[in-house]
Amino acid sequence: MVAKVCVIGYGVTLSPHKDSHPVRPINSGLAQTKPKPKKKPKPKVKVMKTVNQSVIDGEIDDYNSRSPSPDVDSWQMDTETDIHTDTSDKPRTDCVNKITTKLNGTIVSPKKNIQKDTLPDSIASCTRPSLFPRVPPYLKFVRHDETSPLKIPPAIQKHLKWKLTTITPIVVKKTLTNSGFRLIKSECDTAECPQEETLDWIGIWGKHMKSLMFRAIKEGQKMNHFPGTFQIGRKDRLWRNLQKLSAKYGVSEFGIMPKTYVLPHDMKILKHEWEKHVANDERWIIKPPASARGTGIKVVSRWAQIPKKRPVVVQRYVSRPYLINGSKFDLRLYVLVTSVHPLRIYLYHDGLARFASVKYNDELSSLNDRYMHLTNYSINRLSKNYTPNEDFAACEGHKWTLDTLFQYLKTEKAVDTEALWESIKDLVIKTIISGEGSISALTKANVGSRYNCYELFGIDVLLDEDLKPWLLEVNISPSLHSASPLDIHVKGPLVSTVLNLAQFHVPARTNLDALQPGHDCKLDGLPYDSRLYTVYLSKEERDKHLIYTNIEDRQTYLREILNTLTSDDVRSLICAEDELRVCDGMERIFPTANTHRYLTYLAGPRYYNRLFDAWETRYSGDRHAGISLLQRLCATGYHLEAPPVPLKNDVDAPTPPASTRPSASDVPEADSTATANAAATTASAAATANAAAALRVCGPLAPPPLALEPRA
């Protein structure tokens, strides 16, 4: 029997032959029948009559020629798919034995051998190919100490411009120059470097900026921050966010930070708490809410030492820390977030263990000794007792690598380092999740492309005498200063890995004719393609988002959400799979097949996080099967089917292009946060209403009549 299935976006409509039996799941043992050949249908893409379209290689290429239209809500991607049943008893990860899809008027067979275009050696040596066909390659970043810098064709290198800032670390500069980048200053305006060239940079490593300023970032440019990460970078905001989660889910889950009071707001509460513990000589540590590198920090035990008007955070002091050789120490962890929608978190395998330069004691008389109670390198390097560590593999001096520390704990102290590492990963995920709601809202409101942002965090953790990790603070611009061979050993590979995971493309303005004078190879897929990173959704994709974010049962969305992948789904998945190829030294700790419990803690259900939960559940044990599935879809160009403009009345759509936006003014960050949160609230209400409408149109999401592979 042959069942004809029309797939529109995510929806599945079944039209069996007149004499067919009732439809059964694909694994029910129906005999396989070859379908009759069909005429090639015309593509069903609705556009305005005034649009000037061009058809290239059977695909409609109107991405840059379309303008917003009132009819954009009816834009949809239609295909017809013949599903052939399979009676084989062999285990398989794919749901369908064969899919033949009519895509934009061209019949394609995803299971045929995929032919990849071969790039010239000069280009292949400086780029990293994607795992997937019809996805542009990524620029390759080599380490800072690479003795043979990359050789890049002049037609590409002239566009590899990196905008310098006052805080761009030296190790980042060395990595960039070895990788073929030209470093430009924002004030550069000479004959050799005219002012307009400073606007064409493709990367920048700078300070965090106000959320509205992210709207000025162009397509094809990357910034090393997301909007709103001050929500975890400021000690007061971090505590408030964790406090909300702790109140909702319990201290056992979110009691990861020592009890903190934000002054002057919490002055009365702190006074009451202080009086309860005054007889115990309780120690407290005072910190400015937004400082770094130990500035303004002191340990106190008397109420008179507490500032009464100045904004500070007062935190209960962990008075029984884990000691090594009699000294207190903390851990600097490096955490990379490459995406917020979906949330993807990486933890660097190495880091720093920073020791206090004076041996620890808990006498009240010692509280003024900063070299005993504070572990910041910026403070302890000034101590006469400070000893640098010149050997990154040695357990000596006042700074060790994280790898060396864990080896020491395992061999010398018989510590279960695997369990300790798992508890640290749990702390990191909860820390990022605590600010996810605001970061998500501000990113949606101010960032126009998924390509624009990534962020490296420095998370400081203290171990108590029971080896419980305590969160101290989060740095949104962690120091990459490398003053010793040990620092270089840790931070050098870190920088190149971060830049490779950020996945930069060759700029779209690259002159392809100059790269292929002989025209003996295809380079049309070489530069950056904005369709891969669009945040715009078709109506069908939006409806699928609404339905699957309103499903409460996890097993339901695990069973159904992958049945029919949309083009937007495929774009998200191929980006994540390409990242996993180059996470050298980085471990993706979220999402994994075992992190679904953290989805409960998010500000609300997120479609992409559920998509990845299902993907990891199904394919984490057999990544090759998942990659092969995506490769077959990409071979058809399916992932490049992207709406050129947002849907009408789409509250989640990004802001207009930079040329039509108001200039970023000094709007207080709190105001932009409130605006974004209000938009998020409106979006939630609209989502509920639209989901109900979608359910009325599409029917309830019962188990699907056919177990479909993603439509090709």
Question: Where on the chain are the PLM-derived regions?
Answer:
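Acidic, PEST-like segments
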Residues: 2-216, 229, 233-248, 255-257, ...
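Short glycine-enriched loop/turn motifs at secondary-structure junctions
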Residues: 156, 223, 254-256, 289-294
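Short amphipathic alpha-helix with an adjacent loop that forms part of the alpha/beta core around
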Residues: 270-277
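Hydrophobic residue at the +6 position relative to the catalytic HRD Asp in the kinase catalytic loop
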Residues: 459-461
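Short, acidic, Ser/Thr-enriched surface-loop or helix-capping motifs
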Residues: 464
